[in-house]
Amino acid sequence: YPYATELTRESTRVQQQANLDRAIRRLETDIAGQAVTTVQNATNAESAATVQAQMAAQQQLLSRMQSLKASGRIALELKPERPEYPDLPLEDGDNIIIPTRPGFVSVFGAVLAENAFIHRKDATVDDYLERAGLLREADIDAALIIRADGSVEGNTAHRRWFGGGGFMGKELQPGDAIFVPEKFDRRS
């Protein structure tokens, strides 16, 4: 399945890990600053409980991020119908894997049924999310398609002036995945 070819490189992995570590430090700082402000603004026991729940959710996110390890994968951004490999010089130690064609699309995150669904030609993001079911706290505006070729597409419809974007109508390829994050209350 050439579309899903994986190219991993050690120098890329090192750079990705450095970027991830910086993002974690930034998130730690943001959480600490937000915690102080939010606790100071809590006016009663109910709002204090809400603040505590928000802080627990943010700590969970931080813990998950801290457990991530960079892969070194380079997204080749191939066309599914006619994958052509880019003219990219190889380095010693590069690893290339051409997987077999999967027959599914994965859906995970804030959904009722995290699952791998049978790939259906012409099925869209909306079709797969309907099968998985969205949780009440699903943040569909921040949903992502993680393509089998390693590229990622975000839901940019809410950032476009004329309501375009078409995220929910995008077709998926075998091996693609949809991630739907949870909404976090960003009040301070």
Name each region found by the language model:
Residues 1-188:
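Ser/Thr/Pro/Gly-biased, low-complexity, turn-/loop-rich segments
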